[in-house]
Amino acid sequence: SECAAVFILYGTILDIGQIVKRIRAAGKLAFVHADLIEGLSNRGEIAVDFLAEATKADGIISTRPNLIHHAKELGLITVQRFFLLDSISFENVVRQSSHADVIDILPGAMPDVIRRLSQRVTQPLIASGLLTDKRDVCGALAAGAVAVSTTSEELWEA
């Protein structure tokens, strides 16, 4: 597909390096979700060190502010993922996202929330999760998201 970046949401400490290598060889940016890689999750800052040094990932995705902060110190591009469940979690995004380069919000099929959030934060927004058709993607982008993240291969080409 014509996407510029790939979010890696799976893998193990044994294969993540090869996954990143294949993505980068295709000319795409590789972002590893540090919280989801088996053998790295729950390892703290050392996991970020590993991703930066051993895999040469372009950036990380994490829900954990300490990992985002450490990744920034290492020069990685950071994507902080937030699950928006209610107005309290919405305000948490505004309050806690100051260190990330990009904010990834889930679910992504909420154009009104994306619009409101884009007016409250300075970072670009990515909409992820529960994007089921082209209408959801277009709605998220029209509301202010700069990109979407989806596992739906048919939407990659939409």
What are these regions (language model features)?
Residues 6-12, 66, 103-110, 130-158:
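Glycine-rich phosphate-binding active-site loops on the catalytic face of alpha/beta enzymes
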Residues 18, 70, 113-116:
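Phosphate- and divalent-cation-binding pockets in alpha/beta enzyme and binding domains
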